[in-house]
Regions:
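Active-site and donor-binding regions of nucleotide-sugar-utilizing enzymes
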Residues: 3-129
Length: 131
């Protein structure tokens, strides 16, 4: 059975990941998952190694005040991924967190496959013409 570790860093990433994984579960039921996720992934039956709320800090000041906790969670996450030994590390959004973790994992296990997924951004241009 192939294993996928899903790594999100905030609620929006959890929501995006759950949409992808719910489709994947319909296509292939022979996949095993572990995550850092929230309620959306949990609703799909996917266990999270800790609650996503433990790493969600809004604003520069909150991040600075919690930098030690954040670094501990990064180390905890890297160790959990290495121990789980997934076939794929699926990172979603939150590049400051997810890509930092992925980089550390790749240093320990350079053969691990990774995919980083982000929501498409829409750029709206309004053309104002003069009469």
């Amino acid at each position: 059975m192939k294993k996928i570790f899903i790594l999100t860093g905030e609620a929006s990433g959890d929501k995006l990941a759950s949409k992808v994984i719910s489709k994947l579960q319909k296509i292939n039921s022979n996949l095993e998952y572990l995550s850092v996720g929230g309620d959306n992934l949990k609703s799909l039956g996917i266990k999270s190694i800790y609650d996503l709320k433990e790493i969600t800090y809004l604003g520069f000041t909150k991040v600075i005040l919690n930098i030690i906790t954040i670094n501990k969670k990064i180390n905890e996450t890297v160790n959990a991924i290495i121990k789980y030994n997934p076939d794929l590390l699926f990172t979603v959004d939150s590049p400051d967190f997810t890509l930092r973790v992925a980089e550390r994992v790749k240093k320990i296990n350079p053969k691990i496959k990774t995919i980083h997924y982000v929501a498409p951004q829409v750029l709206s241009l309004i053309h104002i013409s003069e009469p």
